[in-house]
């Protein structure tokens, strides 16, 4: 009990002493102005016996330029399929909002639904006239994104795939733009006519 009261007294003295707390800095110019101590390295702010050390020069993310050219996609087709219409509508709305935030042009259309029916016996040991019909309805949403870079497509796809709801499947089809190979750039008939002229002479 005596130790507790002694510890409480020490804590109170330390808490009251925080008001007269001072900071010594060896580097840079410091100026004290009405409860604020500004330094070139750190900023110290005091509000009612509470101080926070905040680094003044926060490191900004550095944008790196790579030598490798980015992939270009002409079209990115995302086919989402599921059994619940409300879930697909909600997910389509989410995907459109995410695309608009990234500045991507997007079109959404709804392909016709696919219905599979299975006709089975009610039980294994029963007459043929006692049957049950099961039905599986698969609904689709197709998201068409056009004119994307590879990095933008990767970021967008990762974001929408991480937030894919349960019971929903996704198929992604990418149409990539490629440079025309060197052997196709020149028309073949021009080289053939030159070879014929050389063989004649």
Curated annotation (Swiss-Prot):
It is found in: Mitochondrion. Disulfide bonds: none annotated. Keywords: Mitochondrion, Ribonucleoprotein, Ribosomal protein. The keyword Ion transport does not apply. InterPro entries: Ribosomal_uS10_dom (IPR027486), Ribosomal_uS10_dom_sf (IPR036838), Ribosomal_uS10m (IPR040055). SUPFAM superfamilies: Ribosomal protein S10. GO terms for cellular component: mitochondrial small ribosomal subunit. SMART domains: Ribosomal_S10 (SM01403). Component of the mitochondrial ribosome small subunit (28S) which comprises a 12S rRNA and about 30 distinct proteins. Belongs to the universal ribosomal protein uS10 family. This is Small ribosomal subunit protein uS10m. It comes from Pongo abelii. The lineage of its organism: Eukaryota, Metazoa, Chordata, Craniata, Vertebrata.
């Amino acid at each position: 009990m005596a130790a507790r009261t002694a510890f409480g007294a020490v804590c109170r003295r330390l808490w009251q002493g925080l008001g007269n707390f001072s900071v010594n800095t060896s580097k840079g110019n410091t100026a004290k102005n009405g409860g604020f101590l500004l330094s070139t390295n750190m900023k110290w702010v005091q509000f009612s016996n509470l101080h926070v050390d905040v680094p003044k020069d926060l490191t900004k993310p550095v944008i790196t330029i790579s030598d490798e050219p980015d992939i270009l996609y002409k079209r990115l087709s995302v086919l989402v399929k599921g059994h619940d219409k409300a879930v697909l509508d909600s997910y389509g709305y989410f995907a459109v909002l995410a695309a608009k935030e990234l500045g991507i042009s997007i079109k959404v259309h709804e392909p016709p639904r696919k219905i599979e029916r299975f006709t089975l016996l009610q039980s294994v040991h029963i007459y043929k006239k006692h049957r049950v019909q099961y039905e599986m309805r698969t609904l689709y949403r197709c998201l068409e994104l056009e004119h994307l870079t590879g990095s933008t497509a990767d970021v967008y796809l990762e974001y929408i795939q991480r937030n894919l709801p349960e019971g929903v499947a996704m198929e992604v089809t990418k149409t990539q733009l490629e440079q025309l190979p060197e052997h196709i750039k020149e028309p073949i008939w021009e080289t053939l006519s030159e070879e014929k002229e050389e063989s004649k002479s």
